[in-house]
Design a protein with these regions (language model features):
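Intrinsically disordered, low-structural-confidence terminal and linker regions
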Residues: 1-27
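Conserved N-terminal entry element of GNAT/NAT acetyltransferase domains
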Residues: 27-75
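Short amphipathic alpha-helix that is part of the acyltransferase structural core
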Residues: 55-103, 110, 114-118
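Secondary-structure boundary elements
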Residues: 77, 91, 119-122, 220-229
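Short acidic (Asp/Glu) patches
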Residues: 97-103, 109-114, 142-157
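Conserved beta-strand in the GNAT
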Residues: 116, 123-133
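Acyl-donor binding region in acyl/amide transferases
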Residues: 136-249, 253-266
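Charge-rich, low-complexity intrinsically disordered segments
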Residues: 247-292
Length: 292
């Protein structure tokens, strides 16, 4: 039996040597090609990043000339936010069941504020976000009910901080028409009621950055409300996109299932502001003026 094992070990060793030898030959032959391919990939990534940064700089400078952050205070404005939520969650993705009012809301809205991004020329709303800001002990965050068991960083649990210092970002949504790069004007008018003729090339150029506008609207709100500890159960892709554009967040747990795939994030607000890029600060300063 020992001999058999030794024989097997010997054969395995010989095969390993053959593979190593083969790999050396292959790597020698392919080394230059692989190195060239790697350099091409790096060059393309750098080119893409440079193009993105160039586009971002333009948008950050001009975004607030075309779009404004609006704190929903009137019944009409609140309904506009709830309507976007119904459109995306109930009609488009069908995550929630729709209703006859075409408005989506829940119990958290009782101690939350809604913010909208509005296109100045047309008055259309291009996105919404909900900011849940509890004050009383019986007012909880969604992450405390749905995601707390997935949080590994126990030192960053919401219960460790005063209730009036915590908040959660949720329902950050953009209507489908504003998520498109190419727009069929006739179909847009027929299906959404939005007159895309009122949008010039610069307006449409800002569309991919509406999400950033919503992030900055949140930031302006939290700054004005004195919030220090922010939580966010984000779609993994959304979380990554926020970090790609330079918005710093700390992942505090594993991905889990809640209204789709979600990742729990924590934002130390003071640290977030300190690390904010100059281009973001420009947009933030403009929004702080309009959101009180």
């Amino acid at each position: 039996m020992l001999a058999t094992q030794q024989s097997k070990s010997s054969n395995t060793f010989e095969k390993a040597n053959e593979l190593l030898a083969s790999d050396k030959v292959l790597s020698e032959q392919e080394r230059k090609d692989r190195l060239k391919a790697k350099r091409i990939r790096i060059a393309r990534l750098r080119q893409h990043e440079a193009k993105f940064q160039e586009e971002a700089q333009w948008v950050f400078k001009h975004f607030t000339q075309h779009f404004s952050a609006v704190l929903a205070q009137s019944e009409k404005q609140l309904e506009s936010a709830y309507r976007i939520r119904h459109e995306v969650f109930c009609e488009e993705t069908r995550i929630f069941e729709g209703n006859d009012t075409k408005l989506e809301s829940d119990a958290y809205d009782e101690y939350a504020e809604q913010c909208l991004i509005q296109h100045d020329k047309s008055g259309d709303y291009a996105g919404c976000v909900r900011l849940i800001m509890p004050e009383a002990d019986n007012e909880t965050l969604p992450i405390e009910k749905q995601g707390v068991q997935y949080i590994d960083r126990k030192d960053l649990l919401p219960c460790n901080f005063p209730r009036n210092e915590i908040a959660e970002v949720s329902r950050i949504l953009i209507p489908k028409v504003f998520r498109q790069r190419k727009i069929d004007k006739a179909a847009c008018a027929a299906n959404t009621g939005i007159n895309i003729e009122l949008y010039d090339e610069n307006d449409i150029r800002c569309f991919p950055f509406i999400a950033v506008g919503l992030y900055m609207a949140c930031t302006a709100m939290f700054k004005n409300r004195g919030k220090k500890h922010i939580y966010f159960m984000a779609d993994p892709r959304l979380g990554k996109s926020m970090q790609v554009v330079g918005l710093t967040m700390t992942q505090i747990g594993d991905e889990f299932e809640y209204v789709g795939r979600r990742v729990p994030y924590y934002i130390d607000f003071e640290n977030f502001l300190e690390n904010l890029k100059p281009s973001f600060k420009f947009m933030l300063d403009e929004m702080i003026k309009t959101i009180k």
